[in-house]
């Protein structure tokens, strides 16, 4: 089982869409057994797959020791995906209940994922766009980090703080940066090379070749609670996410 944490330090980087479509492509086109984890209290991944976050338990009850992880896994209709939804309790989980007094609480996720390691080929975690307890826990549990950004100044500059955060964790726990995925890409952007250079300085050699172009069909698919592969299979977003998944699989094979 390979565990991938999908990260950003700024909202609006298509982090959740990347998580969803990487998982969907692995399941649909590569017959992989995939578990998606919504670890962001905003619960956009949960909503984007057609579930109401107010109706389901999140990993919060598992990390608090109230339920087993198998009890909170939900199969997603018409896909080969399983999901652990998010809820608002995740926002304050580390200062609640059993976790509040546990100095090693950020290592619990890694422990609980061990019980499903034979059930899935990939676990993909959608983390909050901040350097918080949830993000740290996800990175400690992960084998790989996939970083999301947009070709905008503040998004790219935020990578510097994220890089330091990841470096601190990887010094204590094995973690490989899989790559930096750029979304909302404009092939004719005047500053494309400048943004690429900034990313290269922060994460040398990690900028992925596949860029995700802006495409309204992704938002339209979310309204229906489905991946864009299901609603607009010929859209450029479908092509881009399919190619991104292929590129990442090659990297995973070679690492």
Swiss-Prot record:
Recorded coiled-coil stretches: none
Q: One matching Pfam family, short form?
A: AAA_31
**Protein family:** Belongs to the ParA family.
Question: In its UniProt entry, what is this protein called?
Answer: ParA family protein CPn_0805/CP_1066/CPj0805/CpB0834
Source species, please?
A: Chlamydia pneumoniae
Q: Top-down, what is the taxonomic lineage of the species of origin?
A: Bacteria, Pseudomonadati, Chlamydiota, Chlamydiia, Chlamydiales
